[in-house]
Amino acid sequence: MASTTPITMEDLQKALEAQSRALRAELAAGASQPRRPRPPRQRDSSTSGDDSGRDSGGPRRRRGNRGRGQRKDWSRAPPPPEERQEGRSQTPAPKPSRAPPQQPQPPRMQTGRGGSAPRPELGPPTNPFQAAVARGLRPPLHDPDTEAPTEACVTSWLWSEGEGAVFYRVDLHFTNLGTPPLDEDGRWDPALMYNPCGPEPPAHVVRAYNQPAGDVRGVWGKGERTYAEQDFRVGGTRWHRLLRMPVRGLDGDSAPLPPHTTERIETRSARHPWRIRFGAPQAFLAGLLLAAVAVGTARAGLQPRVDMAAPPTPPQPPRAHGQHYGHHHHQLPFLGHDGHHGGTLRVGQHHRNASDVLPGHWLQGGWGCYNLSDWHQGTHVCHTKHMDFWCVEHDRPPPATPTPLTTAANSITAATPATAPAPCHAGLNDSCGGFLSGCGPMRLRHGADTRCGRLICGLSTTAQYPPTRFGCAMRWGLPPWELVVLTARPEDGWTCRGVPAHPGTRCPELVSPMGRATCSPASALWLATANALSLDHALAAFVLLVPWVLIFMVCRRACRRRGAAAALTAVVLQGYNPPAYGEEAFTYLCTAPGCATQTPVPVRLAGVRFESKIVDGGCFAPWDLEATGACICEIPTDVSCEGLGAWVPTAPCARIWNGTQRACTFWAVNAYSSGGYAQLASYFNPGGSYYKQYHPTACEVEPAFGHSDAACWGFPTDTVMSVFALASYVQHPHKTVRVKFHTETRTVWQLSVAGVSCDVTTEHPFCNTPHGQLEVQVPPDPGDMVEYIMNYTGNQQSRWGLGSPNCHGPDWASPVCQRHSPDCSRLVGATPERPRLRLVDADDPLLRTAPGPGEVWVTPVIGSQARKCGLHIRAGPYGHATVEMPEWIHAHTTSDPWHPPGPLGLKFKTVRPVTLPRALAPPRNVRVTGCYQCGTPALVEGLAPGGGNCHLTVNGEDVGAFPPGKFVTAALLNTPPPYQVSCGGESDRASARVIDPAAQSFTGVVYGTHTTAVSETRQTWAEWAAAHWWQLTLGAICALPLAGLLACCAKCLYYLRGAIAPR
């Protein structure tokens, strides 16, 4: 019998050499025995010549790529076209001699298909041709006259640490199907053992597969399959190789190895290698059963228990009877959920579900087509005093033709009949005609509705809140359990630690005049077990448990190292510490650096910084509209920067003169004489052509008759005065702007929690401290931003633009959408238009307005002494070049990149019970603005006192907890002023500006005006889909990445199967 000791690579080497010697002896002994004639066949140099007559086309021919689905069969090369036509084979080529070189090089060998081909010169075969050459030498082990056994393909695996979790699969014929050819030194060539029967792996995988390695790291077994694991390096890259070992002994004994039925999980192995059976059906079934019980317990097993010794439930207030319309109502497909309208209505003598009569919640919308009356009334929903009322518009004329009603979520626009609307009612004395409740004016939310003064006659039909229902929740399926309020009826009076309970409130115990409610695990254990066996809970348990069981199986199968199971068990069972929180505290922290609060440990905002990916957008020099000029009490003969050097600054004049699109104008005021000789007015007309003949100038020359020459005072009326103005767009030498784009911007809030530094972001809003866990409600990140670093005359400042520019829209000409140079030498945008110069008198009413775009106004100013005058220049907007100017950057950017809209919310969970400090002094300067009993929250603001958190109450109703300092919040008010506010101790009166709704019957929100354009209250699914198209679109968009994620996980598991269960 074969030994059960695992086979190593050294044993495999020795066994293959023994096989080669036995094969040579067998062939030598069979050479003397007569054999039947057979056609000649070209043989390998390493085999005997007695097998030269072997038939290559018989049934013993090897079959490559069986069952592997490969299109090309590289295990056999097709015969040449000459052989296919003539049916002959070539004469075998002479066997070349091989001299042992310094580096072992493969010799030329025969392919078994007629002719010879060179062996690969670069080591292992790396292409189909070299693989076919290597596969051409496979002499059989058994008698050639007998039929060969069925060939089998085995799978080995390779993976590299340099390529991540990429597993390469190599399918090849096992070594017992043929003996490798021997070299002249008597050793077999490992490169020729590579005999794939599946897809060809890449070249570097083939090299790694044929890399010799004598170290065996471990031997693994699965069933009757044995694998040897090795790790080695190829060119500096570490590879792992999992090789399939033979299932039969190589010493001739055909007895198989015993199956691996034992499983050893201790950390050390005494003698035998550690073997693991892959699979955990028992663990899966046991986990499935436990999860079914746990999920059933979590979902429906734990029922809240109410103390039956408490006082009975108080009676419900009486409800009046309203007029009943005997129409049949159909339940809408999207209504009937547990919410505000989950109760019942009493209309006349009939009880109806609220979902059959009332539409969705007044804040949620989502109602369809329904009608309670005939075609003479329209229907409404009025929300007042925190309740919804079913209202009817009276005395409405019937429509001529029914008009289809288009419904949409949160919409108040409805179809109107074809006839004219009803006339307005002027007063409130009109009768509602049989209705039992009062009337009041209708106030529509939609501002475009001009119908006024109509009456809304409300039925005495009140909406009852749904009954209070509780549920139980637990953390990680372990005690303690908490009571969860599913639906709450305010008149029941359930409170948690003195705070009224709302849907979603979690509390260990609730108290009300009815008694106490809590979750008792002992009383519901049997019910939990029974519910776990039901079909729905078992299905839920299966859905929730299967992913965790798969993760467990993957971890167990992937951790095949020695001692991995024991280590994993220690980590899972001993390294888990369930969180235990003592108390939870919530407060707010302002966003200014240095703000601090107490929750219950001191928390201070140390600073705020931004992190982003920066892309340099280059640098540019902005345009600058510059103008200069001079007022001269004579007419100059040389109108230029050189000729006017005594009156005009030389440097600005030269810069403007050399600018782009220059505008230069010379005016002569009252020009009658100059230089002692008289000149006519035509001397300057038209366009100064006569003047330019005698005086060189490049400017426009224009007379200025009618303008006052009082600037040159103290002279007779025949004196003259000239005004010279020059303007152009120039590149300012001391103005540069560098653009930087900030993407993936996120805000990092630097907090100090009891002296422990902590940074929170939107991705990680938690701080784990020795005192407990702090969860911060941080505002969203600002998004993409553009930074303009402006350097004006050495004074550098940064301006920030929020959002990405719309370069294909209105921002096409902005500096951020232009291409800039790194050296700040390029001007942005197109060349500006030419400025327009205009001479304006000092008393001209035009000066009361502003210059237009691209205009420059020039006004002479009387000097302080004779023959001295000045010039006042006013420049308007930049015109076409507006967006290229620094002023545009200032107008479209801000110095503060982003300021959060409100304070940071802090939720602190302590590791042990802590008594939180509470302020007892009343708040100061509390102002209440809004309305009460109108369904909309009112604004409450003021200053909280010091000494701890202020648990603010307004007329006994809890509003929230606030740290010392200014607070702003919103609250629903149920009582009229005056309002008493307190922090749990002494109270104070607050100033209030609220709307009194008592004078009107139906105030607040009146929405959903519906006419009787349909004959029944049914809504089709197509109408519902049209009303919720954006939700369906959002769901479809979310389904796309979800499908991609599932496909990625499936692909990952498909490739990971090689590491979990190689076959």
Swiss-Prot record:
<keyword id="KW-0812">Transmembrane</keyword>
<keyword id="KW-0325">Glycoprotein</keyword>
<feature type="region of interest" description="Functions as E2 signal peptide">
    <location>
        <begin position="279"/>
        <end position="300"/>
    </location>
</feature>
<dbReference type="GO" id="GO:0016020">
    <property type="term" value="C:membrane"/>
</dbReference>
<feature type="binding site">
    <location>
        <position position="719"/>
    </location>
    <ligand>
        <name>Ca(2+)</name>
    </ligand>
</feature>
<dbReference type="GO" id="GO:0039654">
    <property type="term" value="P:fusion of virus membrane with host endosome membrane"/>
</dbReference>
<keyword id="KW-0946">Virion</keyword>
<feature type="glycosylation site" description="N-linked (GlcNAc...) asparagine; by host">
    <location>
        <position position="429"/>
    </location>
</feature>
<feature type="disulfide bond">
    <location>
        <begin position="758"/>
        <end position="767"/>
    </location>
</feature>
<feature type="topological domain" description="Extracellular">
    <location>
        <begin position="583"/>
        <end position="1028"/>
    </location>
</feature>
<keyword id="KW-1035">Host cytoplasm</keyword>
<feature type="disulfide bond">
    <location>
        <begin position="590"/>
        <end position="595"/>
    </location>
</feature>
<feature type="compositionally biased region" description="Pro residues">
    <location>
        <begin position="93"/>
        <end position="107"/>
    </location>
</feature>
<feature type="disulfide bond">
    <location>
        <begin position="641"/>
        <end position="653"/>
    </location>
</feature>
<feature type="disulfide bond">
    <location>
        <begin position="153"/>
        <end position="197"/>
    </location>
</feature>
<feature type="topological domain" description="Extracellular">
    <location>
        <begin position="1050"/>
        <end position="1063"/>
    </location>
</feature>
<feature type="disulfide bond">
    <location>
        <begin position="950"/>
        <end position="983"/>
    </location>
</feature>
<feature type="compositionally biased region" description="Basic residues">
    <location>
        <begin position="59"/>
        <end position="69"/>
    </location>
</feature>
<keyword id="KW-0694">RNA-binding</keyword>
<feature type="glycosylation site" description="N-linked (GlcNAc...) asparagine; by host">
    <location>
        <position position="371"/>
    </location>
</feature>
<feature type="disulfide bond">
    <location>
        <begin position="931"/>
        <end position="934"/>
    </location>
</feature>
<keyword id="KW-0472">Membrane</keyword>
<feature type="binding site">
    <location>
        <position position="718"/>
    </location>
    <ligand>
        <name>Ca(2+)</name>
    </ligand>
</feature>
<feature type="compositionally biased region" description="Basic and acidic residues">
    <location>
        <begin position="70"/>
        <end position="87"/>
    </location>
</feature>
<keyword id="KW-0449">Lipoprotein</keyword>
<dbReference type="Pfam" id="PF05748">
    <property type="entry name" value="Rubella_E1"/>
</dbReference>
<feature type="disulfide bond">
    <location>
        <begin position="619"/>
        <end position="824"/>
    </location>
</feature>
<keyword id="KW-0261">Viral envelope protein</keyword>
<feature type="glycosylation site" description="N-linked (GlcNAc...) asparagine; by host">
    <location>
        <position position="353"/>
    </location>
</feature>
<feature type="topological domain" description="Cytoplasmic">
    <location>
        <begin position="556"/>
        <end position="582"/>
    </location>
</feature>
<dbReference type="Pfam" id="PF05749">
    <property type="entry name" value="Rubella_E2"/>
</dbReference>
<keyword id="KW-1162">Viral penetration into host cytoplasm</keyword>
<dbReference type="InterPro" id="IPR008819">
    <property type="entry name" value="Rubella_Capsid"/>
</dbReference>
<feature type="glycosylation site" description="N-linked (GlcNAc...) asparagine; by host">
    <location>
        <position position="658"/>
    </location>
</feature>
<keyword id="KW-0106">Calcium</keyword>
<feature type="binding site">
    <location>
        <position position="670"/>
    </location>
    <ligand>
        <name>Ca(2+)</name>
    </ligand>
</feature>
<keyword id="KW-0167">Capsid protein</keyword>
<dbReference type="InterPro" id="IPR042500">
    <property type="entry name" value="Rubella_E1_1"/>
</dbReference>
<dbReference type="GO" id="GO:0019062">
    <property type="term" value="P:virion attachment to host cell"/>
</dbReference>
<feature type="site" description="Cleavage; by host signal peptidase">
    <location>
        <begin position="300"/>
        <end position="301"/>
    </location>
</feature>
<protein>
    <recommendedName>
        <fullName>Structural polyprotein</fullName>
    </recommendedName>
</protein>
<keyword id="KW-0945">Host-virus interaction</keyword>
